[in-house]
């Protein structure tokens, strides 16, 4: 009878160990999925960094990578703390600032180089983001450079 009890206890213990292992496995799967999601979002961000100056359709990007648009936007927002569209706009404005600072291209040329088809829309968006027009931004850079060289 004592052997039977210890045999039953042993079975219960093995069963508990099995449950613990299964529980640990279920906890690990989301991590792998999260890592995969992070890799997918990093690839998306890299794609946007390389192609920000072209017309990018978030819907087409998501569909071509077998993602629903809502899932893609939600996961990208978790990855980058911004939506894909805002991320692309930010890349465009950042690169426009660099071009305004380092080139003599006019506003229309810069607008086209950073992916805007409409220079007026570009100027309005730039003003909204930076608090001044692209022309004012460039003039401010010239004034700052002149005052620093004195």
What are the language-model segments listed below?
Residues 46, 50, 55, 59, ...:
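Terminal helix-turn-helix DNA-binding modules in bacterial transcription factors
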Residues 70, 120, 135:
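Key DNA-contact positions within bacterial/archaeal DNA-binding proteins
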